[in-house]
From Swiss-Prot:
Residues 49-207, 249-407 form the Cupin type-1 domain. GO terms for molecular function: identical protein binding; nutrient reservoir activity. SUPFAM superfamilies: RmlC-like cupins (SSF51182). SMART domains: Cupin_1. Seed storage protein. This is Canavalin. It comes from the Eukaryota.
Amino acid sequence: MAFSARFPLWLLLGVVLLASVSASFAHSGHSGGEAEDESEESRAQNNPYLFRSNKFLTLFKNQHGSLRLLQRFNEDTEKLENLRDYRVLEYCSKPNTLLLPHHSDSDLLVLVLEGQAILVLVNPDGRDTYKLDQGDAIKIQAGTPFYLINPDNNQNLRILKFAITFRRPGTVEDFFLSSTKRLPSYLSAFSKNFLEASYDSPYDEIEQTLLQEEQEGVIVKMPKDQIQEISKHAQSSSRKTLSSQDKPFNLRSRDPIYSNNYGKLYEITPEKNSQLRDLDILLNCLQMNEGALFVPHYNSRATVILVANEGRAEVELVGLEQQQQQGLESMQLRRYAATLSEGDIIVIPSSFPVALKAASDLNMVGIGVNAENNERNFLAGHKENVIRQIPRQVSDLTFPGSGEEVEELLENQKESYFVDGQPRHIDAGGKARRAHLPNLFRTFY
């Protein structure tokens, strides 16, 4: 019983399923007898963990940029109820633009996906100005007024904002100081008497100075000389430390935790960064060469939200589903397969085995919630492979193949973490040769 609690048998079955699929990656669909020729569109509709880029709702858009909000994670499924407090936003802006001052009712983790930004945080005693580059991240506490500038003359800015809601679970609201055609300043909601007393000025002067509609939207063009003046005071992110209490940090400020000729994974955990510790979040950046495979693995505690930033990826995720037949409840393995394009998002629940293949050169960013004390357990590869730690006597009773066959199979792969996604045992017709697979995998074909 102690062994089962530490290493659930269904995870072993999951890696067997993933490994059999990896032998021929063109093999698609779901387990349990579902049609193998199921279309990508059909698989997407049946995958509650997949969010296409068209699942973003446009909150604001003009000629200078846009702000989009991903639908609630639990909007269409109860399987992601644990993510009800989290929302994902995407901010894009053209060169030399300003996102007007505002504050959010949620804690925000801001991550630069593309371009450069000047972020200014306003506080009662002054303001902090930071220059953000690609891969930089920073926590913005709820209620903190801030504004964003794209200082570049040519490159667009793209930022991912991860919101941790608490006032109204799952609801993110921004409060803008300025009046626009879309929404008046929140100051305008106060009565004339309150405003006159607060500013010790007549209402006409207050209205003309603070409240009249000035802009077409919350993203506006900004003169270059004004940008240069603000940029003079900007601090860059620290590449030497991960533990700053309030300053930006970069995802690639340290060596990757996994790296070889096929790919790299950079990761910052709550244990290494106080801002992430406050939010109980991990951040990672996955880079893979075309054709590489990130071998089957699972996270012990963290549920990871993966965003396809550049390139395309084939993802296979193994989970359990409850089935009821003749009044009896049972569990069934299910494989969720998807091809991700730029802007798509997939959620990897904790304990669900997953494998990814780069269909092109690939860059993805991951945000893991409930991340403190998380461990990543690999189910294939030479290093950190938990199956390799199972003694032969137990393997004899766990798998169809003998313990010796299991050990021989696991020794075949000399690489770790990232491997060549093209199986070596391919016949002239492009199909995996089953005869060369040990008994461990034959029963899953």
